[in-house]
């Protein structure tokens, strides 16, 4: 089993719903450690850059607009198999398909406003973490 880091974003809908604490509680209870976090308001440049791989997709502008609609909480999570564990805790992208007890089943209202983002691979995690954090902002937790 590999100790990994993954990027997590609590999206504007979940922030507005005051679900940050409940979502963080699920991360920590699953064994993931929060090693970096910042609340931020994404602008067009930051949201567009983060989702650049989707620029040609029909949902791109709506996605950017949603991600700029309110503050987000961007975090780095660390732990054994953090990427897969985080994705399991999040649940399916569409909350209608998400398993009971997952973040999206409990806190998301639609496929568009689905509460959280998580890296889907080690490569994506490295790219996404470095997009929002510099090395000094990520603090290893040894105890």
Curated annotation (Swiss-Prot):
Pfam families: NDK (PF00334)
Assigned EC number: 2.7.4.6
Keywords annotated in UniProt: ATP-binding, Cytoplasm, Kinase, Magnesium, Metal-binding, Nucleotide metabolism, Nucleotide-binding, Phosphoprotein, Transferase
Family annotation (SUPFAM superfamilies): Nucleoside diphosphate kinase, NDK
Record localization: Cytoplasm
Catalytic residues of the enzyme: 117 (pros-phosphohistidine intermediate)
Catalytic activity annotation: a 2'-deoxyribonucleoside 5'-diphosphate + ATP = a 2'-deoxyribonucleoside 5'-triphosphate + ADP; a ribonucleoside 5'-diphosphate + ATP = a ribonucleoside 5'-triphosphate + ADP
One GO cellular component term: cytoplasm
UniProt GO MF annotations: ATP binding; metal ion binding; nucleoside diphosphate kinase activity
The protein's role, per its UniProt record: Major role in the synthesis of nucleoside triphosphates other than ATP. The ATP gamma phosphate is transferred to the NDP beta phosphate via a ping-pong mechanism, using a phosphorylated active-site intermediate.
Family the entry assigns: Belongs to the NDK family.
Protein's UniProt name: Nucleoside diphosphate kinase
């Amino acid at each position: 089993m590999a100790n990994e880091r993954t990027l997590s974003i609590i999206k504007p809908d979940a922030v507005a719903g005051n679900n940050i604490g409940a979502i963080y509680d699920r991360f920590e209870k699953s064994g993931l450690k929060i090693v970096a976090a910042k609340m931020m308001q994404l602008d067009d440049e930051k949201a567009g850059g983060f989702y650049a791989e989707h620029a040609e997709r029909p949902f791109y502008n709506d996605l950017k607009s949603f991600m700029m609609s309110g503050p987000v909480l961007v975090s780095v999570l660390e732990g054994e198999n953090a990427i897969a564990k985080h994705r399991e805790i999040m649940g399916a992208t569409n909350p209608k398909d998400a398993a009971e007890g997952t973040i999206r089943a409990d806190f998301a209202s639609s496929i568009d406003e689905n509460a959280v983002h998580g890296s889907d691979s080690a490569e994506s995690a490295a790219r996404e973490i470095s997009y929002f954090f510099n090395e000094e902002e990520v603090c290893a937790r040894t105890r």
